[in-house]
Structures are given as structure tokens and as C-alpha cells.
Amino acid sequence: MNEHSLIEIEGLNKTFDDGYVSIRDISLNIKKGEFITILGPSGCGKTTLLRLLAGFEDPTYGKIKVNGIDIKDMAIHKRPFATVFQDYALFSHLTVYKNIAYGLKVMWTKLDEIPKLVSDYQKQLALKHLKLERKIEQLQKNNSNAQRIKKLKEKLQKLLEINKQKVIEFENKEKLRREDIYKNLEQLTKEWDLLSQKKLKEVEQQKQAIDKSFEKVENKYKKDPWFFQHSEIRLKQYQKKKTELKADIKATKNKEQIQKLTKELQTLKQKYANKKAIDKEYDKLVVAYNKKDYWTSYWETYTLQQKEAFEKRYLSRKLTKAEQNKKVSDVIEMVGLKGKEDRLPDELSGGMKQRVALARSLVVEPEILLLDEPLSALDAKVRKNLQKELQQIHKKSGLTFILVTHDQEEALVLSDRIVVMNEGNILQVGNPVDIYDSPKTEWIANFIGQANIFKGTYLGEKKIQLQSGEIIQTDVDNNYVVGKQYKILIRPEDFDLVPENKGFFNVRVIDKNYKGLLWKITTQLKDNTIVDLESVNEVDVNKTFGVLFDPIDVHLMEV
């Protein structure tokens, strides 16, 4: 385990039954207390990744480690996560208070320490003493029978001595009970460890046997060069190729050519049938291996889960009503719901409903909070307010937050680090400044904010010649290769308009749009390359300007 990582995702894959690959062998480490945002367009796999973490989906293979333990076979309710959903998922018949408190009904806490239990027991016994003392005081006030008062005082003294002995007995009994529990737990832990080690060896042997079967199947592929040449061929490609060959046969009049194409078609059918049979064997082995990998995960966490179940039964208790009330009150204060406790969800705005959903997840004290696009259904102003509150709650709680969103601005505002995803792959991981200013690819540059992408050649000494001929400079030195072509990124807001021939190069204005605070200006280089920029001042269409920019804002990307 990476000593600084709370979550370690290793080679995680999710392939659905129809063959669609949603998550493609991704790996990611998340530190304790981080605010991580998984950012990408619809269908990129970000929500699937969140569902895999929460346990709503099972991975095809790979590992999801929390505190060094693979949890992919762990039940949802045992995972250290709580989820805030986009659609709130509130109970419509319960008040705000009861919605938030709902999860506490099944929440357990450690048994109180023995001194606390003894103190509580003493308080119970003291109530009896108090009743007797009050009775004596009342009799004395009323000048009642002195003999009766004397007897009651003797009774009180005797009760004090008896209860003192009871407290000692109670404390000794509780100590012995706990000693027995801990001894039993120690013995059971040894037995669980032995069993899990035995089972892990058995599973490892079974996996090794499957590995040998993999080798046999791979040898079948190696026997025929055709399989290597067509390793990626699938049903659609096969049908397309078959249709093309049939069309060629039909269109050809030359007998020799017809025979050649017919033979090629027969070979294709035979080879594809053979490959399909071998693929089927291979796929069966993959399924078998992945099942064994789940058993590996199960037996690796077996002792821990058995120990937790034992401790819950013998060394834990449910929360008292007073404890529940305090937790709910604290979280209501934290998320800004004070005064709304008795309202029903239908009486709340969208922003308030999302606060309730957030409070309900926070109150159960998860180690990690998963947020599935919780702000996407809210209007812009409410969303921005809640973004600020989310940041404050994250700082106050110290929890690890994992947010899924397609909103680039939201990701840049909230995150410690951003994970950019597309088509099931992680493309880049970095802090918001790195992701925005130094994207690894043109796709990321265009997805996050607006981007001007130029083609150019690196000349050395931090100089670049654009395809249109202009020479510009960068402050970034990343061992770029002299003479190599790169794609150059400059953001629209990094340009400054100056009079013609006073800048690094000239542009002609071809369009303008007012955005409120700024004008979005569309311009053109002399080779017709489009350059978008922003200006606080309105400019005239068809007018030519020079442009300036800081070399540090010039970023090079691989072609």
C-alpha cells in the first residue's frame, strides 16, 4: 500500500454483458482528506467508476483498495462510503430531521469504557438513595415519628453499603466479561487467519492452473499467423469483410479472380470460425480467473470482516436517542438547515433538498463521501452558493470527497485534483491549474475551457514557428525536440489586443459576441486560422489588430 493513499484503484475494468467496455484498466491513488473530481463528458465512465466504488456495480476485474484492503467483494453497507445522489432520493413522508436521522437507526458505536459504565450504574443506584433521603427530610419537616426516621436512616446506611458492594461486583463482572470476550476474539482471530491463509493458497493454485490453460489457448493463436494479422477482428468487421468479398465476386467476370476471391471468402469463414472457438475458450478462462480473483479478495478480508462482525455483536451498542439527536443537530448546523427540521421534502427548494441529502450522508460519519453530480439539477446561482458550502463542509469535516461532474468550471473551483476521463480511460490527473494551463492532449484542452490550438515547429531556445509563419516564444522548457512539430495552446483570455503591427502578429476581426463582462472576439490569421480571444472593449468587425501574450501562457502538446 502507498503509505499516503486512502484509496488505490489498480487495473480496474468494467465490461458489461453486451461487450461494452465502460472502464478500461484504470489505476488511480486518492489521498485521505482530498477533494477529487472525476470529470468527463456523458458516457465517459465516470458514473460507472463511482458505482464501482460504492458497490452498486461489480468490476469485471481489478482491485479497489481502501486502507490497503481490496473491498470489491464487500457488501455496500460495509463499505466506508456514503453517496449523495443527483435526484436527492429523500423519503417524501419524513421530515427533514427524520430523513437525516434515518441512517442512525442502524449505526453502532463501541461499548462505553468500564469507568463510564460504572459511573452510569452508580447514578442509577443513587436515584434510590435520593428518594429515601427526600422521604427522611419530609418526615423531619413534619416532626414525624422519630423512631420511624431512625429506621429509615438505618435503611439508607444499609442500602449505601449494599450498593457500594454492588458497584464493586458490577465492575468486576464487567471486567471478567470483557476479558473473556477479548480472549475469545484472540483465539477466533487465529482460527480465521489460518482458514483464510489456507483458502488463499487453494485459490492461488487454482489461478495458476488457469494460467497454464491460458498458455495452451495462446499457443493455439500462435500456430496460425492469420490470428495475429486479424487479432482485433470482431463480428461486425467479419460481416463487413464477408459482404465486401461477396460483392467483389458478384461484380467480377474473370473466372480466375472469382476462384481467388471465393477461396479467400472460404478461408475467411473457416479462420473466423476457428478464431471464434478459441476466443470462446479464452473468454471462459477470463471469467473463471476473475471469479477466482474475487475469492482472493474475499479471503484477504475474511479475518477483518469476521472480526468486525464479532465486535459489533459483543463490543458495540446502538446509539442512544440523545446521541442521535446531537449528531443530527450538529450536521443540520453544518449544512445550514437550522429552522427547517420539521418541513417535508415537498416544502423545500431544490437547493434545500440537496442540503438534506448531503446532511443524511454526513451524519453517518463515512470515511469517504461520493457525490454523483449533486448540483447539476440546480440553477446557476444556487449551484455556485452550494459549491462554496461544499468547500467549507469539506474543510470542516476532513473527509475524502469524490465528486462526479461534467461541469468543467465546477471541477476547477472545487477540486484539489481533477481526474479527466474519456471513453473509459483516465487521460490526465492533476491540480486545477495543471489541468487548465498544461493539458496533455488537444482533446483535454478543448474539453476544459476554450482553446486556440496552433500547429508549429520547435526551433530551440524556447522559440516556436507557427504553421502560418509567425515566430513566438514560450517560457516552459520541457526538453522539447528541436525541429519537431507540436500543437500549441493559447487560451482566449491570455491575448491582449493592441494596434496593428504592435503585437507578435496581426489578426483580423470576423465576428464578435457580448457575454456580459467580456466580448468574445473571433479573429483570423493571414492563413485563415481562427483565433478566439476575449476583450473588455468592443471592437469593429473587419478591423485588424496586433495581439500580445505572455510566453508563460504558451503551452506545447504532442501531435
Swiss-Prot record:
Q: List, for all copies, the residue spans of the domain called ABC transporter.
A: 7-448
Q: Which topology term describes how it sits in the membrane? A: Peripheral membrane protein
Name the record gives this protein: Spermidine/putrescine import ATP-binding protein PotA
Q: Which PANTHER family match?
A: SPERMIDINE/PUTRESCINE IMPORT ATP-BINDING PROTEIN POTA, SPERMIDINE_PUTRESCINE IMPORT ATP-BINDING PROTEIN POTA
Taxonomic lineage is: Bacteria, Bacillati, Mycoplasmatota, Mycoplasmoidales, Mycoplasmoidaceae
Please state the gene responsible for encoding this protein: potA
Q: How does it assemble?
A: The complex is composed of two ATP-binding proteins (PotA), two transmembrane proteins (PotB and PotC) and a solute-binding protein (PotD).
Q: Which Pfam families match?
A: ABC_tran
Enzyme Commission number(s) from the entry = 7.6.2.11
